[in-house]
């Protein structure tokens, strides 16, 4: 049985970002008690492939001397501060698009840097640039694996980190030394999270907008027809609220072929369950990650098929767009590669990758005028004017982050 309303809903999403194998999933486990890399291929390869997420309560407690400390496991003299959602993003270079789509849900980030490797590693640099590009300012740097190094190396690593973040969005971010494996300094990290990553102010009175990051079929093979559950969509509300019984629309919906034409049909359904972590709710508000049970055929939602879509009230979601005009802001250098390469100007007829909220789509540049670019998209997106869009280019057989654009118009 699912316990009902045992814990308040999470109010903030915190990204876990950094280079592959620097201990992000182990740190998520230390903070939440939840193992996020449970996908079969993730266990086999030892890396995160999909976005993982886990919730944890944060308690402020007082010891016998009256000194405060923070923990997820309360004893006497403890008060619940809030519940937080951790978004565990993959650190492997081939999975940068997944990390970027996750950044659309993040209100703050933990940048994990291993003390036993030189800083910066390629994806450390790439992920920090991604945070900068997506405007995520509330950052705590976690110097992990201090149990594997000498005191001298730990201090040297600290200096490398300070030099690396100088002049960046994380220049003044606190650096917390931890051993995620041994649960060392996790209480200090919780304290830093409470101090430096505040709960945002949400517009709960608006119509709901939910960015979908995952979608599932939770039915096991052989489930009797009368016991089959509808498709599940997972993501985060950025405004408004959703309750059981609400009729919702999902855009872009389903792709069909009619004759020689591809047609996209919006999907409508009813909310039948709402969950955050292991708890069920009658209503969810913005902040944190939630799983929304629907009456959709689970075949439609299986295998993250609805990732990148937007859900909201029927008729209150943005129309789908096959082209967009962006004001482009390019980086000076390509990040994420071992080689130092300059970012060339965007050219007409060039194919680029665009991360629009949780959606990744490829588009061809149809026109360039100064910093403005017009793009025809291979797959449509649901978006709003003014949104930031990450721009990637194929460099040395990998999609690399080259800058961002601000949406000026959509068609």
From Swiss-Prot:
Segments for region (G3): 88-91
PANTHER family: EUKARYOTIC TRANSLATION INITIATION FACTOR 2 SUBUNIT 3 FAMILY MEMBER, EUKARYOTIC TRANSLATION INITIATION FACTOR 2 SUBUNIT 3-RELATED
Domain tr-type G: residue ranges: 9-201
Oligomeric form and interacting partners: Heterotrimer composed of an alpha, a beta and a gamma chain.
Annotated stretches, region: G4: 144-147
Location of region: G1: 18-25
Sequence segments annotated as region (G5): 179-181
Residues that hold Mg(2+) 2 according to the record: 21, 46
Region (G2): 46-50
Function in brief: eIF-2 functions in the early steps of protein synthesis by forming a ternary complex with GTP and initiator tRNA.
GO cellular component: cytosol
The keyword GTP-binding appears for this protein: yes
GO molecular function, one term: GTP binding
Protein name: Translation initiation factor 2 subunit gamma
Cofactors: Mg(2+)
Catalytic activity: GTP + H2O = GDP + phosphate + H(+)
E.C. designation(s): 3.6.5.3
Entry annotated with the keyword Hydrolase: yes
Binding-site residues for GTP, renumbered to this chain: 21-26, 144-147, 179-181
NCBIfam families: eif2g_arch, PRK04000.1, small_GTP
Chain positions recorded as Mg(2+) 1 binding sites: 25, 48
A matching Pfam family: eIF2_C
């Amino acid at each position: 049985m699912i316990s009902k309303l045992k814990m308040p809903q999470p109010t903030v999403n915190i990204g876990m970002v950094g280079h592959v194998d620097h201990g992000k999933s182990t740190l998520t486990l230390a903070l939440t008690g939840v193992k996020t890399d449970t996908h079969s291929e993730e266990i086999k390869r030892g890396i995160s492939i999909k976005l993982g997420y886990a919730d944890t309560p944060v308690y402020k407690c007082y010891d016998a001397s009256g000194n405060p400390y923070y923990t997820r496991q309360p004893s006497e003299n403890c008060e619940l501060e809030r519940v937080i959602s951790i978004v565990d993003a993959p650190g492997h270079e081939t999975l940068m698009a997944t990390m970027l789509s996750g950044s659309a849900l993040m209100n703050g980030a933990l940048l994990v840097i291993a003390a036993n490797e030189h800083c910066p590693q390629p994806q450390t640099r790439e992920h920090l640039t991604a945070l900068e590009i997506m405007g995520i300012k509330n950052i705590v740097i976690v110097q992990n694996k201090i149990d594997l190094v000498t005191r001298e190396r730990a201090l040297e690593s600290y200096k490398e980190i300070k030099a690396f973040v100088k002049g960046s969005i994380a220049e003044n971010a606190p650096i917390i030394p931890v051993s995620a494996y041994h649960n060392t300094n996790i209480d200090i990290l919780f304290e830093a999270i409470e101090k430096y990553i505040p709960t945002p102010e949400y517009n709960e009175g608006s119509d709901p907008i939910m960015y979908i990051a995952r979608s599932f079929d939770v039915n096991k093979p052989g489930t009797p027809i009368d016991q089959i559950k509808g498709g599940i969509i997972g993501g985060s509300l950025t405004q408004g609220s959703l309750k059981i019984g609400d009729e919702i629309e999902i855009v872009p919906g389903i792709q069909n072929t009619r004759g020689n034409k591809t047609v996209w049909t919006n999907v409508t359904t009813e909310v039948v369950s709402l969950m955050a972590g292991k708890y069920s709710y009658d209503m969810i508000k913005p902040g944190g990650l939630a799983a929304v049970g629907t009456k959709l055929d689970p075949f439609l939602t299986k295998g993250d098929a609805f990732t990148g879509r937007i859900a909201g009230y029927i008729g209150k979601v943005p129309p789908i767009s096959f082209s967009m005009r962006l004001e482009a802001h390019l980086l000076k250098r390509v990040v994420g590669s071992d080689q130092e390469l300059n970012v060339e100007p965007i050219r007409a007829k060039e194919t680029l990758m665009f991360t629009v909220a949780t959606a990744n789509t490829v588009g061809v540049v149809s026109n360039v005028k100064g910093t403005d670019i017009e793009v025809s998209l291979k797959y449509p997106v649901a978006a709003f004017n003014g949104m930031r869009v990450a721009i990637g280019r194929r460099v040395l057989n990998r999609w690399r982050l080259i800058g961002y654009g601000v949406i000026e118009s959509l068609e």
